[in-house]
Structures are given as C-alpha cells and as structure tokens.
Amino acid sequence: MLVAGSECNSVAEEAATCEGVTKVLYVDSKEYENFLAENIANLIKNVSDDYSSILAPATTNGKNYMPRVAALLDVAQISDISSVESEDTFQRPIYAGNCIATVQSSDSKKVITVRTTAFDAVAKGSNSAEILKLEEVNDAGISEFIKEEL
C-alpha cells in the first residue's frame, strides 16, 4: 500500500493494521499535500517496479492521476471495476450501469480504478505491516494548488 501526503504518518500507521497488507510505502512531503496529479503519477510510476497491479479508488483524485500513471507506464487503464474474475479479467459497468462488461488485459502491469462500493471494506486487526519511509519527491512543476472552496 502507498501512503503519500503531508504530515500523514498516522495514516501510514493505520494502513499497516489493515488485513492483507504486508508493506506500507510511505512518503511525507509537501509536494503531495494537495494530491496534484502530475506529482502523484510520477511517484506511483517510480515505485511501481515491484508490483504487477496498481489500484486506486475511482474517486475524483483516482480518476485524475491513474490515467497519467497508465500513460507513464505505457499500458491501458482498466476503469471502475466492480469485480475481479482472475488476475487479468475484471468486470465493470457500462452504459450508465445498465450492462456489465468483462474486460481482459494482456498488459504485464495492470492500472486499475476500483468502484469502492462494489467491495467489502478491509478489516482492521492486529496486523502490523512493515512501514517503509521513502524519500521520493516529485514536483513536476506543471500545476499549482491555489485554494479549496465549498
């Protein structure tokens, strides 16, 4: 699991307690504070060598940086999956959810956004995964966070 942000040590510690998590990669830097897509995409690409699948929630942020990750890795993105059939086959809704498509990828690395409501939440338990702090800093200098308003 990758945790990136600013002053997010407590998030990394909580992630380490999730069932099934064996290692948490943790990066704490102001460059990741506002989740600028260019910075996060470069970070994910740079730490992806040891992984065959890269998953993110199909949220506004995930839908912003995951296409960039796929492009940097020169693979297709598999969007909004609702089911995993096998290591290379997934189901996803199409036509506004009126049909379900089965998608198979032959890419060696899978870049996937996940429809989180389609899966059960991960249980937190007595698990204590290794937390590995990285010094990976990527400021692409392409975009700048100005402000957030409601």
PLM regions: where:
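N-terminal glycine-rich FAD/FM-binding segment characteristic of electron-transfer flavoproteins
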Residues: M1-L150
